[in-house]
Design a protein with these regions (language model features):
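Phosphate/nucleotide-binding beta-alpha loop and adjacent structural elements of enzyme active sites
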Residues: 1-219
Length: 219
């Protein structure tokens, strides 16, 4: 089961394409990529994404399927792996609410993150080596990447530092069509993210397992 159920017509069409061998693959863990491409932007073949905590370039990737559709974007991760064949601009950096902060970062594959922000998987992550890194902000990354001010999809999965990352960019300047943000059922972080995004014009439209899904509030 995945995050977002398809309509009967969509499901039947997808099944037929799978039989014929022409169906796209969706490598994301819980269907974030399928939600974007089928539910949110089914007619968009040239969208733009921001993948923060991109990790493995293929396995579990929330944005590889988007690139295969023709999208472009930015991948941010201090230790990206298996990015051969990916087309996103890769920034090997750690992001927070402010630039220039020296932080301790645990390098655990898939669960690594800033030591002071780690939540649900903290004990597991702390078993991995730690290095010192200097933070940047998403605002700085977007500026250096010459990103468009409208970004179709934000994927944010950085093990407890999601709210700090959001605060590191101007959400009045950069607008998003859809967001999938990991919360890992951590409070008050989860509620703080929901409230912060609502203040900037977004509402939660779906939730599944460790992610909340957001879209602009309908006017």
């Amino acid at each position: 089961r995945e995050c977002c159920d398809l309509s009967m017509v969509q499901a039947a069409t997808l099944s037929a394409r799978q039989v014929l061998g022409s169906a796209p693959t969706y490598p994301s863990e819980i269907g974030q990529d399928k939600w974007v491409l089928i539910k949110m932007f089914p007619a968009v073949d040239d969208g733009f994404f921001l993948d923060v905590g991109s990790g493995h370039g293929t396995i579990g990737s929330n944005t590889k399927a988007l690139e295969e559709r023709g999208w472009s974007g930015i991948c941010v991760d201090p230790f990206p792996t298996y990015m051969d064949g990916r087309t996103c601009q890769v920034f090997k950096e750690v992001v927070s609410s402010a630039a220039g902060q020296v932080v301790k970062f645990h390098t655990h594959a898939g669960l690594g993150g800033i030591a002071d922000s780690l939540g649900k998987w903290k004990e597991e992550a702390q078993k991995s080596p730690a290095v010192e890194l200097t933070t940047t902000t998403l605002g700085d990354v977007l500026a250096r990447a010459n990103a468009p001010t409208f970004i179709h999809f934000l994927s944010l999965d950085i093990e407890g530092a999601e709210l700090d990352a959001l605060k590191g960019m101007d959400l009045n300047k950069y607008r998003f069509g859809a967001m999938a943000i990991e919360h890992n059922e951590e409070e008050p972080k989860r509620t703080d993210i929901i409230n912060y995004l609502r203040q900037h014009g977004y509402e939660r439209v779906h939730t599944y397992r460790q992610d909340d899904f957001f879209a602009p509030i309908a006017r």
